[in-house]
Swiss-Prot record:
Pfam families: GcvP2_C, GDC-P. This is Glycine dehydrogenase (decarboxylating). The gene is gcvP. The keyword Heme does not apply. Keywords: Oxidoreductase, Pyridoxal phosphate. NCBIfam families: gcvP (TIGR00461). CDD domains: GDC-P. The modification N6-(pyridoxal phosphate)lysine is found at K704. Its cofactor is pyridoxal 5'-phosphate. It comes from the Bacteria. Belongs to the GcvP family.
């Protein structure tokens, strides 16, 4: 290549698109923080003893166009065939108005979990709609705002039954007609809680002494039967009964709640979310009123704001891991908000009539198929069904299955049986093709005419739904595309996302989710594949997954990876199970003590509790580092039973602990394993690695370091990397499992497979040098913010040379004593300046943790710093008595457009200070749509369903 061609090469252009500050801006920032160069800053920040000795060996960075061409080759290796496997996964039509305006819209997919409700009212409303949809269709009292997948939701239901029930039994009963992948995840969860899983026929439940049970309705083989008597008899024995159900079926069949179920779980995937070779999808859980405070996951509730107006928020947060730690109801952090929103919009768009029509059509097509088969001499395993039939095929099973495969049709292969499931995409041509395989000569039209006289004959009368659902106005208003488009935009406009400005949440890494990375997500070659299709049809997914695992091994210094965990919390769980299985394999199953620093993420102790570990807290010193003296004492005290230590690196205090290798060596010397939480991997890539430091296992948050968007509260992914000695203990899967068949932690072997292309694309376009530069720029941005704010706010922790890692903690406690203004007041006031708040009161109460990421440019960093400095000046005015403590712009924040238009302005500061406090807000203004939300009112007056029509009229 000539010198001119080389100079015009745009191969590495993406790195400059991803990183915010250009070279000139970096020089200004380095000057501000008194660093000679970027490399000099890194040398001052990252301890020399943990620096990698050689650069990462990754393929050269690709341009956006080249990356898309490469990933298209993976996609083309997948074979999308007509699929009737069912088993909890179905083809669906994603309404294009939802595809374009939600799934492909950064206004929806770049938002964060709605911890700050004043700037999250849009997706909070949508998630409330989701809860209402689930409550209506299941016939239950309260629902959460999504879980990771149906199988993990079932495992969560099991632990809910144990917490809420009165039985002393350790037995959990699972019906033998539950989806196999669900049974496997339940077995994994039960083992480490010490529960005994008994699998049996539904009718044997009343004779089984159990604390809880899981039934499937309709069953995995399609049977629809009235479970009322079985549930009633089981409950008389103090057994709480959970039922896995299907939302579309619930439009026609009697809902599980009306049969008396205590808990109802399932997947909302078929409500407009592609199968995606297993995910991501939104699962759901609904339960009775009396169990609401023991239910896991996010719950959206109705409250009021400071003016008494209706406002939404996340309710009952004291159940969750970030507050209750090892006593939490679950370790769940990320849910599936984006997918729950899609499913809820599917229900809003179609309404009761539309959903019922889709259900009727799906059922009618299934009834036609069943009638044709029975008229041709085939026997069905069940004559009562909704969308799935199982045919007793005996010795002909393999021949019929092979015939279907030759016709490019996927059926479900069972022992002496074949299963067929229909969905909203099934056509008459599909039935004709199936009739050809089974040598059925019947006419579809003639069969349809015969069935029309008794449309629901295949649903027993006792199992037919008679109650209404989706009656709330929101499900009966937005049925034209124009109406729906405007509703989606109306909600989007209420929310703050990366389209508006920086989201400087510490420990959350809200970096760019580049458009090029997102494009393959909606390709049908990735979206339309069933996770249990024959493995050879997923050659593209297999190749992409193996290549991604190899890249992640190189980046982390680990020897093997599993992509199965659906979230960071799920990855933690899989990692601790790997450690415990390793100890068990060596005859040391008694090792159950997990050391956790006091600064740890709340998920860490919550996860350790889920593996029945004893959590022992290790102190941190005044500089935020693990206290080695206390660590040594705890190791000595628990040496015989020491299982592991869970550390985060850099620490949650935002510093690189210089003695981290020593920590690992101390634990290893005592026979323990080191779990390194990958939440802060964005400050490691290319500079150091968990494997190099001495860790044995980590999860990676692909939705942080590796650019999968947060989606307003999910999806996420938490793959785990391990050293070779732990590789045999990675999670397996009963279907297409690479690591064996057991210890699954997710419903599908590759977890949320369809979002893996995002992280693959990011790594491919950055290359080794680009990834390393991104880490350096993230550190530069954090140190720049820290140095600009340090004259105005105390910075809590810094490293030996006065530097921070990729985030910094500013201490509001002394300022609160001095001025009366709290960290919450600052967080809410930042909304008036056009920013999402930093992380509040974590890892230290009364602080704000700021992580700007590498993607924010100098202008945005300055805008944020200017806002924080201006807020500090406002605090001084309160301290000096210019504004009273009970009436000032900080305690009254955030301010809305309604505030601006008030006829009477009785505040001691002008409207301009309230609403346009900076020059930047006069150029471009984001408006919160409610005033400060009253959290206490919301929990004391808990309402987790859509407000009545009168609230809309007001």
């Amino acid at each position: 290549m000539t010198e001119l061609l080389q100079s015009l090469n745009t191969q590495h252009e993406f790195v400059g698109r991803h990183n915010g500050p250009n070279h000139a801006d970096q020089q200004k920032m380095l000057s501000t923080i008194n660093a000679e160069s970027l490399d000099a800053l890194i040398a001052q920040t990252v301890p020399a003893q943990i620096r990698l000795e050689k650069p990462m060996q990754l393929a050269e960075a690709q341009s956006e166009a080249d990356m898309l061409a490469s990933i298209k080759k993976f996609a083309d290796l997948n074979q999308v065939k007509r699929t009737f496997i069912g088993q909890g996964y179905y083809n669906t039509f994603t309404p294009n108005v939802i595809l374009r305006n939600v799934l492909e819209n950064p206004g929806w997919y770049t938002a964060y979990t709605p911890y700050q409700p004043e700037i999250s009212q849009g997706r909070l409303e949508s998630l409330l709609n989701y809860q209402q949809m689930v409550m209506d269709l299941t016939g239950m009292d309260i629902a959460n705002a999504s879980l990771l997948d149906e199988a993990t939701a079932a495992a969560e239901a099991m632990t809910l039954c144990q917490r809420a029930g009165k039985s002393k039994s350790k037995v959990f009963f699972v019906a033998d007609d539950v989806h196999p992948q669900t049974i496997e995840v339940i077995k994994t969860r039960a083992k480490y809680f010490g529960f005994d899983v008994v699998i049996g026929n539904v009718d044997s439940l009343p004779q089984t002494e159990a604390f809880g049970a899981l039934l499937q309705y309709p069953s995995t083989t399609g049977e629809v039967r009235d479970l009322t008597d079985v549930i009633t008899q089981a409950q008389a024995n103090k057994t709480l009964v959970s039922v896995a159900t299907d939302l579309l079926a619930s439009a026609l069949v009697k809902p599980a709640g009306e049969m008396g179920a205590d808990v109802v779980i399932g997947s909302a995937q078929r409500f407009g979310v592609p199968m995606g070779y297993g995910g991501p999808h939104a699962a759901f859980m609904a339960t009775r009123e009396q169990h609401k405070r023991t239910m896991p996951g996010r719950v959206i509730g109705v409250s009021i704001d400071a003016k008494g107006n209706q406002a939404l928020r996340m309710a009952m947060q004291t159940r969750e891991q970030h507050i209750r730690r090892e006593k939490a109801t679950s370790n769940i952090c990320t849910a599936q908000a984006l997918l729950a929103n899609m499913a809820s919009f599917f229900a809003v768009y179609h309404g009761e009539v539309g959903i019922r029509t889709i259900a009727r059509r799906t059922h009618h097509m299934t009834a036609i198929l069943a009638a044709g088969l029975t008229k041709s001499g085939y026997e069905l395993a069940h004559n009562a069904f909704f969308d799935t039939i199982t045919i007793n095929t005996g010795d002909n099973t393999q021949a019929l299955y092979a015939k279907a495969q030759a016709a490019d049709i996927n059926l479900r292969l069972l022992d002496g049986q074949i299963g067929i499931s229909f969905d909203e995409t099934t056509t008459v041509a599909d039935i004709d093709a199936l009739f050809a395989i089974f040598d059925v000569k019947e006419s579809v039209n003639a069969l349809s005419t015969d069935i029309a006289g008794n449309e629901f004959a295949a649903i027993p009368e006792a199992c037919r739904r008679t109650s209404r659902f989706l009656t709330h106005p929101v499900f009966n208003t937005h049925h034209s595309e124009t109406q729906m488009m405007r509703y989606l935009k109306q909600l989007e406009n209420k929310d703050f996302s990366l389209t508006h400005g920086m989201i400087p949440l510490g420990s959350c890494t809200m970096k760019l989710n580049a458009a090029a990375e997102m494009i393959p997500v909606t390709w049908p070659e990735f979206g339309a594949l069933h996770p249990f299709a024959p493995i050879e049809q997923a050659a593209g997914y297999t190749a992409l997954a193996e290549d991604l695992k190899a890249k992640l091994c190189e980046i982390t210094g680990y020897d093997a990876f599993s992509l199965q965990p659906n979230s960071g919390a799920s990855g933690e769980y899989a990692g601790l199970i790997a450690i415990q299985r390793y100890h068990e394999s060596r005859g040391e199953g008694h090792r159950n003590v997990c050391l956790i620093p006091s600064s740890a993420h709340g998920t860490n102790p919550a996860t350790a509790a889920m593996v029945s570990m004893k959590v022992v807290v290790v102190k941190c010193d005044e500089n935020g580092n693990i206290d080695l003296v206390d660590l040594a004492a705890k190791i000595e005290k628990h040496q015989e039973n020491l299982s592991s230590i869970m550390i985060t690196y850099p620490s949650t205090h935002g510093v690189y602990e210089e003695q981290v290798k020593e920590v690992c060596e101390m634990v290893h010397a005592a026979g323990g394993q080191v779990y390194l939480d990958g939440a802060n991997m964005n400050a490691q890539v290319g500079l150091t690695s968990p494997g190099f430091i001495g860790s044995d296992v980590s999860h990676l948050n692909l939705h942080k370091t590796f650019c999968i968007p947060h989606g307003g509260g999910g999806p996420g992914m938490g793959p785990i990397g391990v050293k070779s000695h732990l590789a045999p203990f990675l999670p397996g899967h009963i279907e297409n499992g690479v690591e064996g068949k057991e210890f699954a932690v997710s419903a599908a072997d590759l977890g949320s497979a369809s979002i893996l292309p995002i992280s693959w694309a990011y790594i491919a376009m950055m290359g080794a040098d680009g990834l390393t530069e991104a880490t350096k720029v993230a550190i530069l941005n954090a140190n720049y913010v820290m140095e600009r704010l340090r004259p105005h706010y105390p910075v809590l922790y810094r490293g030996t040379n006065g530097r921070v890692a990729h985030e910094c903690i500013i201490d509001i406690r002394p300022l609160k004593e001095e001025t009366g203004i709290s960290e919450e007041d600052i967080a809410k006031r930042l909304m008036d300046y056009g920013f999402h708040a930093p992380t509040m009161s974590f890892p230290v109460a009364g602080t704000l943790m700021v992580e700007p990421t590498e993607s924010e440019d100098l202008e945005e960093l300055d805008r944020f710093c200017d806002a924080m400095i201006a807020i500090r000046e406002e605090m001084t005015k309160v301290k000096n008595g210019e504004w009273p403590l009970e009436n000032n712009p900080l305690v009254n924040a955030p301010h809305t457009q309604v505030d601006l238009m008030e006829e009477q302005w009785d505040r001691p500061y002008p409207r301009e200070i309230a609403c346009f406090p900076s020059a930047a807000t006069k150029r471009s203004k984001y408006w919160p749509t409610v005033n400060r939300v009253d959290n206490v009112y919301g929990d004391r007056n808990l309402v987790c369903s859509c407000p009545g029509i009168e609230n809309y009229e007001e």
